[in-house]
Regions:
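A SIS-like phosphosugar-recognition module
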Residues: 163-164, 175-177, 183, 202-246, ...
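Conserved short alpha-helical segments that host acidic/polar catalytic motifs at enzyme active sites
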Residues: 1-244, 248-249, 257-292, 330, ...
Length: 606
């Protein structure tokens, strides 16, 4: 959730750190700070609030030039947002920034207090830096090994020692951390976008790794303190992809990038008109042996999993289950050796999802990961990988990553159905061709947004909103509702339309907007009937349906018409106006679209 940046080299460390932290703002934060190695000691400057507040403090203090330092954006877990709780935390000899949670910090704090240490903040990180200080006798590696041996929890650390002013010590346990390779300069970061302005080569720290980073090079040690080598990767995202490119917000840019993201993700996986997963080990024979598919994810990725479940069961007639990752890992799921667990995560670092993956593997069940970041923790741990090629997604609210997650799940469902003899080759090719043109299908929704803007202006002051739908439309109701409440702060709930009479309809009051999704022909009349029920109780109904659908008079106040498209694939088109509705509602309400309050892009702690 928090952001870490470290730099050792020839440039101004302060400038590099601030630039890197700005690139990590999408991860969410409530305070920020830097520690700079200078002659005579380590200078720490930190501030509650946005990076601008930190910049102002730095400008006033006018620190001496430094070429080595660490920086941090904090999302509060222990201790409220404040200057004193912000990172870095320091002693006269050691300064650290930390992502993660130290579970036994209370017991460690008592032990350190008995030795004379005092504490100013409420954070687990202050306990950790003083624990490291208590173990330091001139050898940083020894101090870190001894201190971290007493710690229970997760952490990504960047550490400065006063006695080693040109060196950053980076340590990783259950929280993501990478190091970047430059020429006469090297970097530490919690995510790739912080490095895109600089040389693109990076290495991912593995579990228990410690990296010693100087301007001259990087050395790696494993959890046992043994020197090791780590694979050097190259980021294929360009810097412009992580910029707004003329759009007022990253979210709007990323919504408009969806056609290109679909093409980039689907096209390489189609061979002679047939879906080809490009995973040699996942043969048709292996696909035929699958018992149950378990789709596990959090938030928006879980909503993509719901679409995947429906596609898998509809096309391949294989039972599929969808689980919220944080529930899956604690409910003792029934898993069999012939099952397949599909893990879905944009970042590849989502804490609960990674834990669910580890649970599946501990039961001997193979795992297929759908992720957007090469070399991420989930990608490295999975048996099979399907990368989505969305490029960097900076806005906290996911849009293009969600769409390509659905695309990959459609490809998987199509290949699974063909391998198991549930789809003939001709029908498989037809549906694959329809999927290939999805980018073309959604483009008109992006080119003409006036109706959606108008609807947002009509309902900008609403206090509550309800989404209803059936089948695929219900899965889209959940995602549309989530987008609206994430970024516009309007209370919103989504329900299976058939559940209205089981309690939900009591919430319908005069003037409340109900967004009814009715794109599925099989259940169209049922959904229309449900929409009419809400209308008769005073709701203002916004109906999303297809151009050819016959809408009875008096059902809806507003109708948004979509192009005719394959029912199975309609979520790819329907989601676009729902994303845009949430976006324009947020803009009109004056909300921070890209960085909504209290939310983080990558949830790397439980």
């Amino acid at each position: 959730m928090c952001g870490i940046v470290g730099y050792a080299g020839k440039r101004s460390a302060q400038d590099v750190l601030l630039d890197g932290l700005e690139k990590l703002e999408y991860r969410g934060y409530d305070s920020a700070g830097v520690a700079l190695a200078q002659e005579g000691g380590i200078r720490v400057v930190k501030s509650k609030g946005r990076l601008d507040a930190l910049r102002q403090k730095l400008a006033v203090q006018a620190l001496a030039e430094s070429s080595c330092g660490i920086g941090h954006t904090r999302w509060a877990t222990h201790g409220e947002p404040s200057d004193v709780n912000s990172h870095p935390h320091s002693t006269p000899r050691v300064s650290i920034v930390h992502n993660g949670i130290i579970e036994n910090y209370g017991a460690l704090k008592e032990r350190l207090a008995a030795r004379g240490y005092t504490f100013e903040s409420e954070t687990d990180t202050e306990v950790l830096v003083k624990l490291i200080d208590s173990c330091y006798h001139g050898e940083p590696l020894q101090a870190l090994h001894e201190a971290l041996g007493m710690v229970r929890g997760s952490y990504a650390l960047a550490v400065l020692f006063k006695d080693f002013p040109d060196t950053i010590f980076a340590v990783k346990k259950e929280s993501p951390l990478i190091v970047g390779w430059g020429e006469g300069e090297n970097f530490v970061a919690s995510d790739i976008p912080a490095l895109l302005k600089y040389p693109r080569d990076y290495s991912v720290l593995e579990e228990g790794d410690l990296a010693v980073v100087t301007a001259q090079g990087i050395r790696f040690y494993n959890a046992f303190g043994e020197p090791v080598e780590r694979q050097r990767l190259t980021a294929d995202w360009d810097q412009e992809a992580a910029e707004k490119g003329g759009y007022p917000h990253f979210m709007l840019k990323e919504i408009n990038e969806q056609p290109a993201a679909i093409t980039a993700t689907v096209s390489p996986r189609v061979e002679d008109g047939m879906p080809d997963l490009r995973i040699p080990e996942l043969t048709d024979e292996r696909l035929r042996s699958i018992g149950t598919v378990h789709l596990v994810a959090c938030g928006t990725a879980m909503h993509a999993g719901m679409v995947g479940k429906a596609a898998i069961e509809t096309l391949a007639r294989v039972p599929a289950e969808v689980d919220i990752a944080s529930e899956f890992r604690y409910r003792d799921p029934i898993l069999n050796k012939d099952d397949l667990v599909i893990i879905i995560s944009q970042s590849g670092e989502t804490s609960d999802t990674l834990a669910a993956l580890k649970l599946a593997k501990s039961r001997g069940v193979p795992v297929l990961a759908i992720v957007n970041v090469v070399g991420s923790s989930i990608a490295r741990a999975a048996d099979y990988i399907l990368y989505t090629y969305a490029g960097p997604e900076i806005a906290v609210a996911s849009t293009k990553a969600y769409v390509v997650q659905m695309c990959v799940l459609y490809l998987f469902a199509l290949r699974l159905a063909y391998a198991r003899g549930k789809l003939e080759e001709a029908e498989t090719k037809r549906l694959t061709a329809e999927l290939l043109r999805a980018g073309e299908v959604i483009k008109p929704r992006l080119d003409d947004c006036e109706q959606i803007k108008y609807l947002a202006s009509r309902f900008v002051n609403t206090q509550s909103c309800f989404f209803i739908g059936r089948g695929f439309d219900y899965a889209l109701s959940l995602e549309g509702s989530l987008k609206l409440k994430e970024i516009s702060y309007v209370h919103s709930d989504a329900y299976a339309a058939g559940e209205l009479k089981h309690g939900t309809i009591s919430l319908i009051t005069d003037g409340v907007p109900v967004i009814a999704l009715a794109t599925q022909k099989q259940v169209y009349e049922k959904t229309i009937s449900n929409a009419k029920e809400t209308k008769s109780r005073g709701a203002r109904v916004i109906l999303f349906t297809t151009k050819d659908a016959v809408v009875p008079e008096g059902v809806a106040d507003y109708i948004v018409r979509l192009d005719e498209y394959e029912d199975l694939l309609m979520p790819l088109q329907l989601i676009v106006p729902l994303q845009l509705f949430a976006y324009y509602m947020a803009v009109l309400r004056g909300c921070d679209v890209d960085k909504p309050r209290n939310l983080a892009k990558s949830v790397t702690v439980e």
